[in-house]
Amino acid sequence: MATLHLADMGADVVKIEDTEAGDYARAMGPARGRSSVFFQLVNRNKRAIRLDLKQPQGREVLLRLAKGAEILVEGFRPGVMAKLGAGYNDLAAVNPRLVYCSITSYGQDGPYADRAGHDINYIGYAGVGDQIGTEEAPVVPNFQIADLLGGALTPVMGILAALIDARSSGRGRHVDVAMTDAVFAHAILLLVGFLEHGKTPGRGTGMLGGGLPCYNVYRTRDGRYMAVGALERKFW
């Protein structure tokens, strides 16, 4: 999604896939033609090539691409790109202006750095998962909060800021984004509750969490649901 936003804004995005299975998203869900609908949606406006980065020839192609690029985005676990000879220092040596963005689950170091994860893990560790649902139990949101906030919007913001600086200073940067950290940084009301009261807000309570009748969801007679958002008296 991060590179999709860049592509939609006009960037020439070249997506690199491995030479065997390629991007597994090609087979995710119903297909339309040779690839899944999901794959086509998130890879619109992109070009694609297949490279085996474990082979010298594949690495050489990547280095040539990086030499003429402004941005590189990678989503491997920490250290993988460096082992392939394509870490930030390797590519900065051939293109000092390169903005190199790494998107990981839990950051480049720390006790969880090498762990894999999915959206549900990231929002759980960040405390957001505990805030979604009713007093009885949390729910699994059918909207990937961490993947989109931490894996797309936060990286794009960092990339664009670094790109502006690189164009004026001539020096690129390593933009390091941990999806769990990005979610936690945006959990403002959760943090406010903890700092003010020493505990996080109860699930299904509070002004924006379902504790008020003027900001809630109600089942209607015809079996649908109605969202009411009238916090201010003038709207009620």
Model-derived regions, located:
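Acidic, glycine-rich segments within the central catalytic cores of soluble metabolic enzymes
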Residues: 125-236
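N-terminal helix-loop segment corresponding to the beta1-alpha1 unit
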Residues: 1-174
